[in-house]
Regions:
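Early transmembrane hairpin of solute transport permeases
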Residues: 29-156
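N-terminal membrane topogenic signal
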Residues: 19-32
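Short, Lys/Arg-rich, polar N-terminal cytosolic tail immediately upstream
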Residues: 1-22
Length: 156
């Protein structure tokens, strides 16, 4: 058995390829397609956040490069967690709407230091993770009337 065959066998068992009627080649093509579909974020996210983030001793170009690397890493880690923990083929990356709000409204508009605003985002993320693991997320979603859910989806 070749290395590729053993790899295909491992991933096939791990992710249930037979049940999903797929194979490693199809999943690799799907992954590349997903990455290319969301790759615009690697350019736009650093451009948006770079307008608000200044780090002493680093040029704006260096800050933009750091933000691009962090964008790539966060998208890769989030997508891998979704794949291996939830067994779902979802590509996750930073959202431009919230990034624009963070950069232009909170940091530049309200004058809050970007470090403080980023700390608030981290705390918010931790709260959402706790709400999900405790099981409150489902109760909160169930409490929202369907018309509100539909209108929020349409508004976004």
């Amino acid at each position: 058995m070749s290395f590729v065959d053993s790899l295909a066998d491992y991933f096939g068992k791990r992710f249930g390829f037979k049940k999903a009627k797929t194979d490693l080649r199809t999943e690799i093509i799907a992954g590349i397609t997903t990455f290319l579909t969301m790759s615009y974020i690697v350019i736009l996210n650093p451009a948006i956040l770079g307008a608000a983030i200044q780090i002493d001793g680093y040029s704006p170009a260096q800050v933009t490069q750091m933000l691009a690397i962090v964008t790539l890493l966060s998208a890769a880690i989030a997508s891998l967690v979704m794949a291996f923990h939830a067994n779902r083929p979802f590509g996750l990356a930073p959202g431009l709407g919230l990034n624009a709000f963070f950069a232009f409204t909170v940091v530049l508009g309200m004058g809050i230091a970007w470090e403080t605003a980023l700390a608030a985002v981290v705390v918010e993320g931790i709260i959402f993770i706790i709400i999900t693991y405790v099981g409150w997320r489902d109760a909160i979603i169930a409490a929202i009337p369907k018309p509100v859910k539909f209108s929020v989806g349409a508004g976004i």
